[in-house]
Amino acid sequence: MGVFTYETEFTSVIPPPRLFKAFILDADNLIPKIAPQAVKCAEIIEGDGGVGTIKKITFGEGSQFGSVTHKIDGIDKENFVYSYSLIEGDALSDKIEKISYETKLVSSSDGGSIIKSTSNYHTKGDVEIKEEHVKAGKEKASHLFKLVEGYLLANPNEYC
């Protein structure tokens, strides 16, 4: 098994505490509300929403995938760090065993956030992951993030 790591970083004008509440802690409610074409629904299969919880994410009509299953690996509300693993679903091919993600929000000098994301692709055998596939997924995630950011800017009293 190989592990391929990809890191991305982008910025937001929203401070980490507010962004973490919306984009991480309440994503299962907020994203289907503001982007139903991307995520139809999220449901907890097992657990209480904390570490070890298993969730099924069902994608919207326009998605190339039907659904995926996530396992929450870590939530650090004080340091704004969230990690989970994609363990089942049609986003995993016969070449990938699982994908682990970590998102960390840190304060930027302008009062906003720097979002640091690390993805670890655990492959079966000696398979290599093509960077263009990863970039396509990152672009979709970035688009969702921008929708959340836009929602927070338009609704300044939410997630305070």
UniProtKB/Swiss-Prot annotation:
Transferase as UniProt keyword: no
Pfam families to which the protein is assigned, alphabetical: Bet_v_1
Tissue specificity of this protein: Highly expressed in ripe red fruits. Expressed in roots and white fruits. Expressed at low levels in open flowers.
InterPro entries: Bet_v_I/MLP, Bet_v_I_allergen, Plant_def-hormone_signal, START-like_dom_sf
Family statement: Belongs to the BetVI family.
Function: Involved in the control of flavonoid biosynthesis in fruits, probably by binding directly to natural flavonoids. Binds the natural flavonoid myricetin with affinities in the low micromolar range.
Name by which UniProt lists this protein: Major strawberry allergen Fra a 1-2
Lineage: Eukaryota, Viridiplantae, Streptophyta, Embryophyta, Tracheophyta
